[in-house]
UniProtKB/Swiss-Prot annotation:
It comes from Streptococcus equi subsp. equi (strain 4047). GO terms for cellular component: cytosolic large ribosomal subunit. It comes from the Bacteria. This is Large ribosomal subunit protein bL12. GO terms for molecular function: mRNA binding; structural constituent of ribosome. Belongs to the bacterial ribosomal protein bL12 family. The keyword Ribonucleoprotein applies. HAMAP family: Ribosomal_bL12. Keywords: Ribonucleoprotein, Ribosomal protein.
Length: 121
């Protein structure tokens, strides 16, 4: 038995809304499917961070070892001593913006090792 697509489409065009509704229900029951559109699920806050492409590395606090943190900031940013000190003294401040996740984690580890408190945003 070969299907004639044109005949099926012509029959559907001539059917009323009620007949089409019954057809959809019959197809759903026969094949165990649903005609409902998939609903987009909102991501949780944690899941959103996991899919984030770039991060801002924020120095929240310099901690007790301010000199070590200033050295680390200079190394990471390439700033001069005065600029790096100003950045550390002005905490909270962004050290780097729009960096990849892996680089952000490296920067965070380096600054935390120096004694700073870091937040990735």
């Amino acid at each position: 038995m070969a299907l004639n697509i044109e005949n099926i489409i012509a029959e559907i065009k001539e059917a009323s809304i009620l007949e089409l509704n019954d057809l959809v229900k019959a197809i759903e029951e026969e094949f165990g499917v649903t005609a409902a559109a998939p609903v987009a699920v909102a991501a949780a806050g944690g899941a959103e961070e996991a899919t984030k492409d770039s991060f801002d590395v924020e120095l929240t606090s310099a901690g007790d070892k301010k000199v070590g943190v200033i050295k680390a900031v200079r190394e990471i940013t390439g700033l001069g001593l005065k600029e790096a000190k100003g950045l550390v003294d002005g905490a909270p401040a962004n050290i780097k913006e729009g960096v990849a996740a892996a680089e952000a984690e490296e920067i965070k580890a380096k600054l935390e090792e120096a004694g700073a408190t870091i937040t990735l945003k």
